[in-house]
């Protein structure tokens, strides 16, 4: 879940947390999220985080003039699937 509900939960060793920030400055809109590991995490979590980042980077490489959204999403999905993962198909994407 990207957008959690505030609670009294205290982070502990092995947790991961996603920080999602947006900004509007001088007519420009930005949005970014990053996942942080809290202390030592399990190897499978590290692997997931590595593939997530690599999938993002694959998509960014395809975000060039002349390409379409499908080119970007294909690169993301291909990288994720190469690691045995899948992509979320609902509740994704938004405009800024």
Segments and roles (model prediction):
Residues 1-96:
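Active-site neighborhoods and metal-handling regions in enzymes and metal-associated proteins
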């Amino acid at each position: 879940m990207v957008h959690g509900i505030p609670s009294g939960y205290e982070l502990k060793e092995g947790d991961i947390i996603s920080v999602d920030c947006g900004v509007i400055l001088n007519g420009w809109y930005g949005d970014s999220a990053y996942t942080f590991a809290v202390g030592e995490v399990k190897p499978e979590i590290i692997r997931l985080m590595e593939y997530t980042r690599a999938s993002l980077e694959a998509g960014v490489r395809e975000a060039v003039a002349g390409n379409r959204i499908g080119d970007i999403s294909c690169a993301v999905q291909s990288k994720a699937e190469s690691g045995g993962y899948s992509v979320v198909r609902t509740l994704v994407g938004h405009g800024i």
